[in-house]
Each structure stands twice: as structure tokens, then as C-alpha cells.
Amino acid sequence: MKKPIGILSPGVALGTAGGAMSSKFFLMALATFFSFAQVVIEANSWWSLGMNNPVQMSEVHIIGAQPLCSQLAGLSQGQKKLCHLYQDHMQYIGEGAKTGIKECQYQFRHRRWNCSTVDNTSVFGRVMQIGSRETAFTYAVSAAGVVNAMSRACREGELSTCGCSRAARPKDLPRDWLWGGCGDNIDYGYRFAKEFVDARERERIHAKGSYESARILMNLHNNEAGRRTVYNLADVACKCHGVSGSCSLKTCWLQLADFRKVGDALKEKYDSAAAMRLNSRGKLVQVNSRFNSPTTQDLVYIDPSPDYCVRNESTGSLGTQGRLCNKTSEGMDGCELMCCGRGYDQFKTVQTERCHCKFHWCCYVKCKKCTEIVDQFVCK
């Protein structure tokens, strides 16, 4: 598989004819241009494929890849090339992105930053321009979502370039158990996710030691952490065969873990993420050298998190005003922490739930609908 070609090459020769003042203004304009270009780069993301209508994604290979791949919002040049080559993969890239976004929102549902999406191709807004631990989690869980979706699509025969898993038989599998079936092709899912997701970072060129180069290294590390988490959590699944459920024979195969398990593991990594900085050789190193170096499965970040308590257009924080909170909780979902000490308002709402359920022979459950008035609390 060919590597995407880098597209950013900001080498510019400056003439001297205009004098010192002209050169000064030219340099200022150039700096402004690249600052704007960086914002544009960060503002567009392949994550937007997870926000599209599924019909639009499936049309990529029905109508023909050439025009649609160029029109898909958020793809870098390298990712567009991969779209042209692997038309049938794009629907599952979108499914993987959607899986990652949903898992992010589940894991952070009780946090001040709750992985909210915005209505543009950045998906998460300006907050992703900050190299925070929240950004680290988002990159990791999105990359993990792509591995998950691609591996499953291979197993289900949806892709022309892969099929069932060819993973080697585990050494600890009992000798009388058969290794076969059609397992999730995690090897292929991992490789393609790496090629596609990392393409944007690898084609960006920035000066060694710059903030932008540190962000690239951070993003690549967290992408890999997400992929590795899916890979390492995959396990052997087995099915019994035999007369009357005797299980005299077992067939086993490699199977993806439930994605909630992946999200839980990455959330733990988020809580213990390592603060990093660039050293003189242009490598990421820990800010606190007394701690163990992060592994390939750990998350890393280079910026402190912004204040998520109040709305801030420059950082992308939406604030917590209007968020529901739990009056009795002392955790992050509690009104004291969620509302950042601003207090909360109380209102009553009507909830309808299934109740008084009974099992009827044979074979259904019949329930009544019960309504109750409950108190809810929202941050001021």
C-alpha cells in the first residue's frame, strides 16, 4: 500500500529588492497566512464522515469515487487518494468515526466537557486545536472506532480486499478445540486504520521544534494508543458443537471486544495521561521525568485543558450553563462541580416509564406505563 505524499512544503525565498520595510511586511503577511492555514487544517477532519447521512457515504462507490472523494469534507489529500483506491472502505470509515464520537459522548456524559459536537466539519469545534488530554482521548477513540468497523466489515464480507481473520492459533488453546470459524480481521483493520487516520499527520510539514510538530507527534501517538487498545482487547470466542448441547467439540475464532470495553480502557488512560514537551532533538518527553515513560497504549498531551466552566469562543468551550446535574452526587456530575460553584435552578418534569411488567405464557412481557413528577436541576 502506497504511503500518501506530503502536501505541505512551506519553503519560500525572500527577495531583497523591496528593502527592509517591505520584507518586514511580507514576513508578517506570511506568518498570518500560515497561522490561518493551520486553523483551516485543524478545522477540517475526517471525523465529519461520522456525521454524514449513511446514504451519502454508501454512494461513494455506487456513483463513482473520483468526484465524490474530492467532495467529501474533512479529508486530507492523502486520505482522498486512499478514498479513490478503496472506495468500498469509506462507509466503514464513517461508521468507525460515528462509533468513536458516540463512545466519547458516553464516557464524558457526566463531565464538564461532554464531547459535544458542532455543526461544521471540525465536528468538535475549536477545542480540538488545543493539545489537551480531552483532545488526546478523542483522537484515540476515533482511531479505535475505525479499527473496530474495518475489522468487522472484513469478517462480514463487505470489503473486496479482505476477509475473515487469518490470525495464528493461540498456543494456549486446548488441542481438541478447532481453530477456525470466521473471526474479525483485526490485522487488516489495524493496518488500514493506521494508513488512513495517520495520513493527515504524516503529510504535514513543520519546523522541527515547533508547536505544530509537537501536535503531530501527540496526535500520532494517541492514534496508535487507540488502535492498540482495540487490538490488545480482542479475545478468543468459541462455539459448542455436539448432540443435545454436549459440547463435545468447540470451534474458536478471534473476536473484537465490545467497544464499550475499549472506551472504558481509554477513559482510564485519559485519567492517567502523561503531560509531554518537546526536547532539543524534537522528540516528545515527559514534563515530569520522575514518572515512567508512557507506553504505546498510554495517552499523552502537550497543553493544559481550557476552562470548561464558561463559554469561550476562542477555546471552543461551551460552558456548563444549562447542563443537567445531580444534586445528591459528590462526583463530577454533581451540581457543585458541574456548575462550577455558580449554583443551579430546580424544575419539575414528567417522566413516563414502563412498570408493573408481567410475563405471560407464552411468550411475551406486558407492561403498564407509569408517569411521575420528578425534580431536575440545571446549572445557572
Swiss-Prot record:
Reply yes or no: does the keyword Nucleotide-binding apply: no
Record PTM: Glycosylation is necessary for secretion but not for activity. Palmitoleoylation is required for efficient binding to frizzled receptors. Depalmitoleoylation leads to Wnt signaling pathway inhibition.
Q: What GO biological process terms does the UniProt entry carry, in alphabetical order?
A: anterior/posterior axis specification, embryo; anterior/posterior pattern specification; atrial septum development; axis elongation; axon extension involved in axon guidance; axon guidance; axonogenesis; BMP signaling pathway
Keywords (alphabetical) are: Chondrogenesis, Developmental protein, Differentiation, Disulfide bond, Extracellular matrix, Glycoprotein, Lipoprotein, Secreted, Signal, Wnt signaling pathway
Q: Name one GO molecular function term.
A: cytokine activity
Q: Which residues form the signal peptide?
A: 1-37
Query: Disulphide bridges in this chain?
Result: 104-115, 154-162, 164-182, 238-252, 240-247, 309-340, 325-335, 339-379, 355-370, 357-367, 362-363
Q: Which domain of life is it from?
A: Eukaryota
Q: Which residues are glycosylated?
A: 114, 120, 312, 326
What compartments host this protein?
Answer: Secreted, Extracellular space, Extracellular matrix; Secreted
Propeptide position ranges: 38-61
PROSITE patterns from the UniProt entry: WNT1 (PS00246)
Keyword check for Membrane, yes or no: no
- Name the residues where the record annotates lipidation as O-palmitoleoyl serine: 244
One term under GO cellular component? cell surface
* Function of the molecule: Ligand for members of the frizzled family of seven transmembrane receptors. Can activate or inhibit canonical Wnt signaling, depending on receptor context. In the presence of FZD4, activates beta-catenin signaling. In the presence of ROR2, inhibits the canonical Wnt pathway by promoting beta-catenin degradation through a GSK3-independent pathway which involves down-regulation of beta-catenin-induced reporter gene expression. Suppression of the canonical pathway allows chondrogenesis to occur and inhibits tumor formation. Stimulates cell migration.
In the record, the note on similarity to other proteins reads: Belongs to the Wnt family.
Q: Which PANTHER family match?
A: PROTEIN WNT-5A, WNT RELATED
Quaternary state and partners of this protein?
Forms a soluble 1:1 complex with AFM; this prevents oligomerization and is required for prolonged biological activity. The complex with AFM may represent the physiological form in body fluids. Homooligomer; disulfide-linked, leading to inactivation (in vitro). Interacts with PORCN. Interacts with WLS. Interacts with glypican GCP3. Interacts with PKD1 (via extracellular domain). Interacts with TMEM67.
Q: What is this protein called?
A: Protein Wnt-5a
- Gene coding for it: Wnt5a
